[in-house]
Structure formats: C-alpha cells, structure tokens
Amino acid sequence: MASRKTVNRRQRPQRATSNVFAMFDQAQIQEFKEAFNMIDQNRDGFIDQEDLKDMFASLGKEVTEQFIDSMINEAPGAQPINFTMFLTLFGEKLTGTDPEEVIRNAFQCFDEDNSGKLNEEHLRELLTTMGERYSEEQVDELFRDAPIKGGQFDYVEFTRMLKHGTKDKDEA
C-alpha cells in the first residue's frame, strides 16, 4: 500500500511537468529545444553538472561547483535535467517575472492619453536617455519584432508578447 502511494506521488509531478508544453507555443518550444541542445554538450538528452560547466566555459565564465550544484538542485530530485524538466524550470522562471499588469503599468506611466500606445520616437528617447540606458542597437533589436504601427508602439500587445510569446507564425 505504501509503495502504491509512493508511485502515485511520483506520477503526479510527471503529469504536472507534461502540462508545461501547454504554456508555450510550438515556436517557443522549438527555441527552448535549440537552447537545450546547445547546453547538452554530450548529447545524452540530459543536462548535468558537466554540461553546465562546459557551457559556462564556452562562454568564458568560470563558475564554482557550488554554483553548478545550485542550478542542478533547482530540479526536483537534484538529478540531470531532461527537456521536459528544462521547460518546466523555464516556465516557473517566466511565471516568476513581473505580472503583465506590472509591466503594462510601467509603460502606462508615459501614456498621457491612456491609449495603450506610445510614440515610437518618444519611447526610443526614453529608453536611450533614462534609467538603465539602452544603446541605439539594443532599441533597434527591441523594436524589430515589436508591435509598431503608424509610429505607435502598442505596449499592451508588447506586454502580451513578452509573457505569452509572439503570434507571428500564426499570422504569416
């Protein structure tokens, strides 16, 4: 009887992690798969301590064993991370970002007519001159896939894109 409960407990998290695929669209899952494959240096289908060390080394970063262990320990059971667990961990991290309302409110501070849109050039100026300043190249990159029509940056749609991904594959 106790072993049956143990088996059931192990199955529940598996079902929960498989639902992670519903959190992302196909394009996002493909991007995560590419990232996973880049980290999985030995191509065994799992990310382990050695894969993480190799990845950081390839980026020119020196990290401690404790840092690597803390990353692996984020996975339940502190075992090598398969793709489903990788997606689950990213899903948890992404849901840990600011809620849509908080992001939208940050933009809304500059939206004098409460239209949900900001003038593209005005936003560019704000991003390059205030707070943590962005370079022109960074702003260009940000604006590349941003919802801008008629010189108006739609921050409501942009916030949705940040939290839920783009729909450009569906619209094409």
UniProtKB/Swiss-Prot annotation:
Tissue-wise expression: Expressed in the spermathecal and uterine walls. Weak expression in gonadal sheath and intestinal muscle. Not detected in vulval, pharyngeal or body wall muscles.
Processing after translation: May be phosphorylated by let-502 or/and pak-1 and dephosphorylated by mel-11 to regulate its activation and myosin II-mediated contraction.
Any one Gene Ontology cellular component term annotated for this protein: cytoplasm
Consequences of knocking out this gene: Arrest at the 2-fold embryonic stage which is associated with a defect in embryo elongation and failure of seam cells to elongate to a narrow morphology. No abnormalities in body wall or pharyngeal muscles and in the number of hypodermal cells.
Sorted UniProt keywords: Calcium, Cytoplasm, Cytoskeleton, Metal-binding, Motor protein, Myosin, Phosphoprotein, Repeat
PROSITE patterns for this protein: EF_HAND_1, EF_HAND_2
Residues with PTM Phosphoserine: S18
Cited InterPro entries: EF-hand-dom_pair (IPR011992), EF_Hand_1_Ca_BS (IPR018247), EF_hand_dom (IPR002048), Myosin_RLC (IPR050403)
Superkingdom, natural source: Eukaryota
KW Calcium (keyword) present: yes
Residues holding Ca(2+): D40, N42, D44, D51
Modified residues (Phosphothreonine): T17
Effect of T17A: Partial defect in embryo elongation
Compartmental location: Cytoplasm; Cytoplasm, Cytoskeleton
Protein's GO biological process: embryonic body morphogenesis; establishment of cell polarity; locomotion; meiosis I cytokinesis; mitotic cytokinesis; nematode larval development; post-embryonic development; protein localization
A Gene Ontology molecular function term of the record: myosin heavy chain binding
Domain EF-hand stretches: 27-62, 98-133, 134-168
Pfam families the UniProt entry points to: EF-hand_7
SUPFAM superfamilies, alphabetized: EF-hand
Further comment: This chain binds calcium.
The protein's assembly and partners: Myosin is a hexamer of 2 heavy chains and 4 light chains (two regulatory light chains and two essential light chains).
Primary role: Regulates myosin II activity and organization during embryo elongation. May be involved in the organization of mlc-5 into bundles. Required maternally for cytokinesis during meiosis and mitosis in the early embryo and for the establishment of embryonic anterior-posterior polarity.
Descriptive protein name: Myosin regulatory light chain
Native organism: Caenorhabditis elegans
Gene label: mlc-4
